[in-house]
């Protein structure tokens, strides 16, 4: 019986960390429970919208403004593996392909690096303690020694989880008006009217991130103060100008999106 318990103990790392998500084969209609994820990344895909009489309402975000049915809404296919997701815009040729992080995984590279480091450490630790348990059981058959080692194993696991949590907490980007420089490309794709994206001198403003962006005159377009927040599982920015306008997105959302700009233009027209 004790031998079976030891074998089970050795497989704890696999049970804890080798959990695989249910694969999603290529399909034009993702699972309903995943619509919130896909319609954040691929908001222009037809599976996100319910269109009747030329008016389309978003299936995932009920408070989303209705839009007119037009070429903005494209046919898409989605494909999810255990470690990444892909969606294809199939209504144009050649197909446009976007690879994203799946929403089940927290999405920043630093986070994944930390997770991988601690997973490896925990796995080695479990196997090391498990091997010591087996050796002691065979050599001494000392129940007291085995109990001590089990307690040590539990303490090791709890301490490692605490250290991991503290490391992740320290790296969170708290609310602030200026995001870290490494994230400017992300923020300036979505909130390109925010003042932290521009370097203005003598009334002429140049984009800090996209060097090929033509210079523009300093005007109200870029006089918005923006507050950004980067949490572990989502990012959002608030445009502070006359009234608040909040946009929530996945932190790993692909850059150079055009659907958001197009949507804003259509809403302005409406």
Curated annotation (Swiss-Prot):
GO terms for cellular component: membrane. Induction: Expressed in the immediate early phase of the viral replicative cycle. Glycans are attached at residue 75. B repeats lie at residues 147-270. Its main location: membrane. It comes from the Viruses. The keyword Transmembrane applies. Keywords: Early protein, Glycoprotein, Membrane, Repeat, Signal, Transmembrane, Transmembrane helix. The keyword S-adenosyl-L-methionine does not apply. Plays a role in virus cell tropism, and may be required for efficient virus replication in macrophages. This is Protein MGF 110-1L. It comes from African swine fever virus (isolate Pig/Kenya/KEN-50/1950). The lineage of its organism: Viruses, Varidnaviria, Bamfordvirae, Nucleocytoviricota, Pokkesviricetes.
């Amino acid at each position: 019986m004790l031998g079976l318990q030891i074998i089970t103990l050795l497989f704890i790392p696999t049970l804890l960390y080798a959990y695989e998500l249910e694969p999603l084969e290529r399909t034009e209609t993702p699972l309903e429970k995943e619509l919130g994820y896909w319609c954040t990344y691929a908001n222009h895909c037809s599976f996100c919208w319910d269109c009747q009489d030329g008016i389309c309402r978003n299936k995932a975000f009920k408070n989303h403004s209705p839009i007119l049915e037009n070429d903005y809404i494209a046919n898409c296919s989605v494909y999810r593996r255990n470690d990444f997701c892909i969606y294809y815009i199939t209504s144009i040729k050649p197909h446009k392909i976007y690879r994203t992080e799946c929403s089940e995984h927290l999405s920043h590279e630093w986070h994944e690096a930390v997770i991988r480091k601690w997973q490896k450490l925990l796995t080695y630790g479990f196997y090391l303690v498990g091997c010591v348990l087996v050796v002691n059981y065979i050599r001494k058959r000392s129940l007291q020694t085995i109990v001590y080692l089990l307690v040590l194993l539990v303490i090791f696991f709890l301490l490692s989880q605490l250290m991991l949590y503290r490391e992740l907490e320290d790296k969170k980007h708290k609310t602030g008006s200026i995001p870290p420089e490494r994230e400017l490309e992300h923020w300036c794709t979505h909130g390109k009217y925010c003042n932290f994206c521009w370097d203005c001198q003598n009334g002429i403003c140049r984009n800090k991130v996209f060097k090929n962006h033509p210079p523009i005159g300093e005007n109200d377009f870029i006089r918005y103060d923006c507050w950004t927040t980067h949490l572990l599982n989502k990012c959002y920015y608030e445009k502070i100008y006359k009234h608040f306008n909040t946009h929530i997105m996945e932190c790993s959302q692909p850059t150079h999106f055009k659907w958001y700009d197009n949507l804003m233009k259509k809403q302005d027209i409406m």
